[in-house]
């Protein structure tokens, strides 16, 4: 089968290969891969039990993702064989998989993707928010509770989609998005809402006095809850903190980690993610093989 453009109809074929990843990076999840498939012109192929996927970087070059299957080293070597031009480029290679690429023949150049390390948190800490280091988060939640007369958090299902879409459109009118990753994310949020069952994500809706003030979408894979989408109305102080805690309480109970993904170099986002005290950051690397 030749490489083909990635679509949401491919989720049932591609998703089972994520079990071969031994790290908790968000790139090998349904939301992490399929929400960005169009922006990065992603294509895929399965050959001899190995999933190969490619993307076009913002520099215009073709990159391979980490091949997924029973024999990842053989998949990496196959990328070199099928791509005789040099260098052969790989992206978002998890730090734990670097020994595999270092073993490839040729000169291997490795560069850290500093803005794309995932923030990994303790699931228990995200639920409890106990101790001095989380006092700021608890204060934000207390402010949210003082702002509204009543509140609720409930699972997001198909019956909520129309109301969530209305909230999302209203929220976006307050923001001035320019073309790029933020605009693409918003486009894909709409797609996920319209194809909730195909994506198979879990979600939650936060209400204040009956009105939606935030929603989240994510997925559970192995021991980790991945938070792909988190949107809240900042006119309700503390809504983001309340939304995060309730979502983790609903879906991360009994898990080990919560992955809140990367900061993409956004300094405000970086501060917000660091303020939640991650247990570690999962580094990723670009690799060129000459």
Report residues per predicted region.
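Conserved donor-binding loop and adjoining core beta-sheet/short helix segment
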Residues: 16, 22, 26-97, 207-234
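Short, glycine/charge-rich beta-strand/loop segments that flank catalytic centers
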Residues: 87-104, 114-118
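Short catalytic-loop micro-motif centered on adjacent basic/acidic residues
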Residues: 89-91, 154, 257-260
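Acyltransferase donor/substrate-recognition loop-hinge adjacent to the catalytic core
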Residues: 106-177
